[in-house]
């Protein structure tokens, strides 16, 4: 088990963006699931971040096919994200 964050005393505030990532390794198989949530209502800036990152993920998935390198997939994602800064 790997922890990406350290629990603390800070209470979640309205508009905070949370990422919950669960990874399982069992019998040589790796499974990973990640979900983003907003505490309350997202600000305009946070909503843009959530929308752009979700669309970037979809474009990365669409780019995967035989012969395409991880670098090619990353480039597809990066180009999309940089157009939406």
What is the predicted role of each segment?
Residues 1-85:
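Active-site neighborhoods and metal-handling regions in enzymes and metal-associated proteins
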